[in-house]
């Protein structure tokens, strides 16, 4: 038995692996683009398959396909989604900029399975791709896959991170530490205030991501080749959105201007910008954890992160902050992905953006990476760290910046003199203030109480 079979397309005959579900156009793409070895993301292929099912159902309702043809296409998609469908989608990310190769890959695979279901020929172009163009189905799939990934992965992960931070903040509320600006000693803060800042950052990022959902759920489908809707039924866009909403449980609607949705990727660029904002917040939190955990003897040593693995192949006993480090690398990757998406978003020359596959890949990678990193940061770093109270107390007792609380009483210059003397002599600020002011020790103990200073005011 031969390892290959002959398939035909508009360019002629081509050898295709005998057991492959795809046909000639997919094989041409495999041959043309041996670039990265990276396939389109699973979330993207899943969304593309769901879109094909929704299209078939809409076309049956609009009498563009027979009930049998549409049913066979829907059944084929169900079979793929229930199986290891990625093995049937070998096309490289770096392919034709419209994503036509991935669209035809889906059309051919579905057509093969649907033909088996129907017992008659289902055509990849005429039936599976009915009323569609790569130029609207791929932008649509980018929106759908990103919206589903936000709903299913990233937003739940960020909510979990906020919940863990808030729970930890309540647990460490009684701990007061030296605040730092410019990495230099500053006025005291509660540990709960530090974590409260983190929580607010993540909640803000979450809110900004949610604001992109209405635009993501607005689809290019129905615009076909250039936005005019040529060869699509006038009611196809609405029918497609309705069917897709039923399939996914997410409300999708036809876009108001299909020319904009096909010729640009502004929504993807906007979403990527908010993903970058979220990445910056995660980077800040990761770095705060690393600094507070630094030491254990020669660093700040304010907290102790959970020990997860040996930290060195040469230094016995060394343990490193691996989860914050991994999170920081994820943040760096997301920031880099955003730069690529911004450049790709500029490539909407006239009626079509021609960097769609790399936009899809980077967008979905950013969402997945941050969803996974957020949960790890929550569960393996924030939830389990321990506070080193003795280190906090030692640093606070020697912090000359506490004298800031005396500014309204003795003035800035006098307070600065006391701070410098305390620092130079390595003495507690309260002892130096006792010598340089007329305030009593009991008064100074009240005025310089770190816990009270965390409340602000005069």
Locate the predicted segments by residue.
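Conserved, well-structured ligand/cofactor-binding cores
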Residues: 1-458
């Amino acid at each position: 038995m031969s390892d290959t079979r002959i398939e035909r397309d508009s360019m002629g005959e081509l050898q295709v692996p005998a057991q492959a579900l795809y046909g000639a156009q997919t094989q041409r793409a495999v041959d043309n683009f041996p670039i990265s070895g990276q396939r389109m993301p699973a979330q993207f292929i899943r969304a593309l398959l769901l879109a094909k099912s929704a299209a078939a159902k809409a076309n049956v309702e609009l009498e563009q396909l027979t009930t049998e043809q549409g049913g066979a296409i829907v059944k084929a998609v169900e079979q793929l989604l229930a199986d290891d469908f990625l093995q049937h989608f070998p096309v490289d990310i770096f392919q034709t900029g419209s994503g036509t190769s991935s669209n035809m890959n889906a059309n051919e695979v579905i057509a093969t399975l649907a033909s088996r279901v129907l017992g008659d020929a289902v055509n990849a172009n005429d039936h599976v791709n009915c009323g569609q163009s790569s130029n609207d189905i791929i932008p649509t799939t980018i929106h759908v896959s990103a919206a589903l990934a936000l709903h299913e992965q990233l937003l739940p992960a960020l909510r979990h991170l906020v919940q863990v931070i808030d729970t930890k903040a309540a647990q460490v509320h009684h701990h007061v530490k030296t605040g730092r600006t410019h990495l230099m000693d500053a006025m005291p803060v509660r540990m709960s205030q530090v974590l409260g800042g983190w929580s607010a950052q993540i909640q803000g990022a979450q809110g900004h991501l949610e604001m992109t959902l209405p635009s993501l759920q607005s689809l290019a489908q129905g615009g076909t080749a250039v936005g005019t809707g040529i060869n699509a039924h006038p009611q196809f866009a609405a029918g497609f959105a309705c069917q897709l909403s039923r399939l996914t449980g997410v409300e999708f609607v036809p876009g108001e201007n299909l020319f904009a949705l096909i010729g640009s990727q502004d929504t993807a660029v906007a979403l990527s910008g908010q993903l970058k904002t979220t990445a910056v917040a995660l980077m800040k939190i990761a770095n705060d954890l690393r600094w507070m955990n630094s030491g254990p003897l020669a660093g700040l040593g304010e907290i102790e992160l959970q020990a997860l693995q040996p930290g060195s192949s040469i230094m016995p006993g060394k343990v490193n902050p691996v989860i914050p480090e991994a999170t920081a690398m994820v943040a760096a990757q997301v920031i880099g992905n955003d730069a690529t998406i911004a450049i790709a978003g500029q490539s909407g020359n006239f009626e079509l953006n021609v960097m769609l596959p790399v936009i899809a890949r980077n967008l979905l990678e950013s969402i997945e990476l941050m969803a996974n990193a957020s949960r790890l940061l929550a569960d393996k770093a924030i939830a389990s760290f321990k506070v080193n109270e003795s280190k906090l107390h030692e640093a606070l007792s020697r912090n000359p910046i506490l004298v800031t609380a005396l500014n309204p009483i003795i003035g800035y210059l006098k307070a600065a003199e006391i701070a410098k003397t305390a620092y130079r002599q390595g003495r507690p600020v309260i002892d130096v203030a006792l010598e340089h002011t007329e305030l009593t020790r009991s008064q100074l103990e009240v005025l310089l109480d770190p816990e009270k200073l965390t409340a602000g005011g005069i």
